Amino acid sequence: MEAIYNPQAIEATVQKFWTDNNTFQAIENPDKEKFYCLAMFPYPSGRLHMGHVRNYSLGDVISRYQRMQGKNVMQPMGWDAFGLPAENAAIKNKTAPGKWTYENIDYMRNQLQSLGFGYDWGRELATCKPDYYRWEQWFFTQLFEKGLVYKKNATVNWDPVDQTVLANEQVIDGRGWRSGALVERKQIPQWFIKITDYAEELLDDLDQLTEWPEQVKTMQRNWIGRSQGVEMTFAVADSTESFDIYTTRPDTLMGVTYVALAAQHPLAVAAAVDNADLAAFIDECKNSKTTEADMAAMEKKGVDTGLKAIHPLTGKLVPVWAANFVLMDYGSGAVMSVPGHDQRDYEFALKYGLAIEQVIAGQEADDINKAAITEKSTLINSGEFDGLDFEEAFKAISDKLISENKGKTTTNYRLRDWGVSRQRYWGTPIPMINLANGESVPVPTNELPVVLPEDVVMNGTTSPIKADPEWAKTLYNGEEALRETDTFDTFMESSWYYARYCSPNDDTQMIDPAKANYWLPVDQYIGGIEHAILHLLYSRFFHKLLRDVGLVKCDEPFKKLLCQGMVLAETYYREADNGAQEWIAPTDVEVERDEKGQITSSISKIDGQPVLSAGMSKMSKSKNNGIDPQEVIEKYGADTVRLFIMFTSPPEQTLEWSDAGVEGAHRFVKRVYKLAHEFVESTNNSAVVDIAELTLNADHKKLRRELHKTIAKVTDDIGRRNTFNTAIAAIMELMNHLGKAKVNSDEDKAVMQEAVRAVVLMLTPITPHLCHHLWQLVGGSDENVEDASWPVVDNSALVEDEKLIIVQVNGKVRAKITVAADASKEDVEALGLNDESVLKFTDGNTIRKVIYIPGKLLNIVAN
């Protein structure tokens, strides 16, 4: 009998068994309830980090649990393989992005397999392979034909030295990351998909997602940003020109003292011809950042265009300014400014000496001379609209604008169309052809895929396909033409991969509708909350597009969403001579702690000198505090890593890495191993008598009661609540009871066998290698644990023959008595009143009242 737990040997053997037997191959079976579990696929960056391990451990535990519930489970894995990091690594390592990516995929696949995740590897996909992205290209051409794709000029970051477009993260303090040149804002043609056509449905269908975190749904609602407002027209004085503005606060219209245009607004550009200050300001704005966060933080600037706008209701002339806080890409590129009731407008008006008028009554403490009054209230100084509240004023003012053909009520969305063009190399080529006449047409279906050449040299500036004029040359209807040399935003690939998993090897169609409609929607999706908006919103949008061309039937891609927390680790550093922090890996630090676990000393293992602790922070390369999963697996085994990950904190919360915690998890795994082996030894390999044939004593019944209470709790914790940590804690508590139990009589062995089998089954989703091995010892059949059913609660075992009753006298505990479970109130009162310990406090007193809470408490009031 094996006395020592050897995780490496067990795990290698079990993983080979799974591979040889295609244990986790998923096949459609209409007679069986399906369960599609998916964790967000990784970018193949080189090595798995602990965040990956946590994400994929959660998915695997859920998948294995659902399999044991008798469901037909699919859990696939693949690679989100396009993206900028591959280009940067290719430049650094002087290799092609494709080669670097495929090598990383091979290494990370081995890491995932070493952790024992039950993936159907026959469904593996990589988004950088033509057999995947050809269908993305095909689908884009279908969207173009449906009128859902268009091309327009949009602003990008332009490096004038490297002559290339930069991603936002490549702009550091306004300069190009390689050249150091001041980055310019430049307009270039880009492709867009009309996600705004689906804005209302994307918003309304959030109500269907009852098993998504409210936080994620709120973030998406805010991003889509539906608002009810009024669109109105301002005419330009002494001109035939006019412009539209949209506002959600028409109640403040009578307080407009100026209007603000985006610097790129056609009226501002035209006015700049004769206005040098305005022209200079427009040039300055070209290089300004345009994210909402950047704009909120930057100094608000503007220049008077010299134009006057005519107030649509009063006819009053108001100045027209060009301002850097108005974006041409948002709305009409013009806003009405009401400094009395908008703080940004207020500060701008103070800065440039513009009028501030109060048209909304404030609270007593409000002072228009100190700040804008932004709350909604009663109108004042608004002529015929005085005395109206917000709702009344909204209707009255919009009605008047409509009656005079100067405005209309409208629903607006903050959401903007999805710009999918990227001026990068390592991505899916956009399947469009630019003709000599300026028209753009889709690549014919029979010429797809447009294959990205992978044998390239990265020079750090221009994309290889942009630098190679021969690659772009093509023919269209016999005429010379040029291919589009932009590639897709990598969110395109990750927006439909979940659906491709349903038929990943189909080379005749994007998705097999029959298979997709069997597996979809995904029953459980798992990933970080940082993907709450873009990835999850784009996937929901893409799914509706797939539905509308008949490839899927359901409205939403992901039924239930779990957002796991980050993995944290201790961080250590020294201050360099220049004041910078030099981060030191936790594995290179010797730490001493007090009895509360607080660090009292941290010494470098390398030079023996003290280092400083910066506390817990997210594992990252920048802080050098990552823990390599491979090293922990090699030391303790994958099951220990999985158990630690699942036990240390609830899935939505942050997980603090702890070497002591890993040691504790390892000890528990060894305890389970030892208990099972010792039980088998105690039976001398002879059959255990069926528990149904035996008469159990009180101790046996108590142990069975603990067992079945544990099964009930673990089933609920894993299956409904997803509180894996409390499920494991319950199993640990049960193990404490089992460790004290005798294994001598037939009854002892029968109860212990039932308990050991249940423990192995309950731990199977969490520590699958160990449990596969132990089930062969204790399972009692030829069935492998992967095909075993989840343990079922025996309700009869939960029935108690006796109850422990607490007896109080005047509110203080004086005795504990054991009574029959079906004892009457009178019997319990008699036993309690005559208990020796109770009589000490009631003798000589009058019993005033006896209160009995059935099965729990007897309270005697005596004086």
Swiss-Prot record:
Q: Where does ATP bind?
A: K621
Q: What is its main location?
A: cytoplasm
Please indicate the residue ranges that the annotation assigns to the motif 'KMSKS' region. 618-622
Keyword tags: Aminoacyl-tRNA synthetase, ATP-binding, Cytoplasm, Ligase, Nucleotide-binding, Protein biosynthesis
Q: Which family does it belong to?
A: Belongs to the class-I aminoacyl-tRNA synthetase family.
One Gene Ontology cellular component term attached to this UniProt record is: cytosol
Q: Which organism is it from?
A: Colwellia psychrerythraea (strain 34H / ATCC BAA-681) (Vibrio psychroerythus)
Subcellular localization, per the record?
Answer: Cytoplasm
User: In the UniProt record, what gene is named as encoding this protein?
Assistant: leuS
Q: From the UniProt record, list the reaction(s) this protein catalyses.
A: tRNA(Leu) + L-leucine + ATP = L-leucyl-tRNA(Leu) + AMP + diphosphate
Q: Name one GO molecular function term.
A: aminoacyl-tRNA deacylase activity
Give a yes or no for keyword Aminoacyl-tRNA synthetase in this entry.
yes
**Which superkingdom, per the lineage?**
Bacteria
UniProt EC number: 6.1.1.4
Gene Ontology biological process terms in this record:
leucyl-tRNA aminoacylation
- Put simply, this protein is called Leucine--tRNA ligase
What is the residue range of the motif 'HIGH' region? 42-52
